[in-house]
Amino acid sequence: MIEQINNFFTIEMIYLWLNLGVLPFWIILFFFPHSFMSKYLVRSIFPFMIFSFVYVYLLYYFFISDFNFKNNFTLYLSLENLSDLFSENGFLIMFWCHFLAVNLFCGAWIVSDSIKLSISKFLTFFPLLITYFIGPLGLFIYWLIRIFFARRMSLYD
């Protein structure tokens, strides 16, 4: 049975499911940020548990296929080493899973913070869209909106 699971969940299939699987969470954040679905499905631990299970499966998958995990630590030594790591599908899919999880976490935080500060969902739509594609820039745009509409500037929560 494990062999069948390994044959079905190839790297390409996991990549496809990661990209399609994150879309419903983002759609809920975009269009229904104040709903119970948003509160209990997106702004909870649920999506990040899914990402964690995928990540653990990927670690298992690469562990049994003799992936060189020690090589991952060389990414901090030079830009060329990082570039070499991104040429490996194993590292690339783990990075992509991490990237999707962090951006979704940032989007969920934006929605939670905007609800707490009573910032309109129409004002948070654009920063959420930017966060979906470019996480840090979307957070910065939301922070600028937060300064003007929440009438307070705070560098920490």
Task: Show where each model-derived region lies.
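Hydrophobic transmembrane alpha-helical segments in integral membrane proteins
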Residues: 2-23
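Short aromatic-rich membrane-water interface segments that cap or initiate transmembrane helices
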Residues: 6-11, 79-94
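N-terminal signal-anchor/start-transfer transmembrane helix
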Residues: 17-37
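Membrane-interface helix-boundary motifs at transmembrane edges
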Residues: 33-45, 115-119
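Transmembrane alpha-helix/helix-exit interface in multi-pass inner-membrane proteins
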Residues: 52-72
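Membrane-interface interhelical connector segments
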Residues: 67-85
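Alpha-helical transmembrane segments of helical membrane proteins, especially in multi-pass transport
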Residues: 88-107
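Hydrophobic, aromatic-rich membrane-embedded alpha-helical segments
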Residues: 125-148
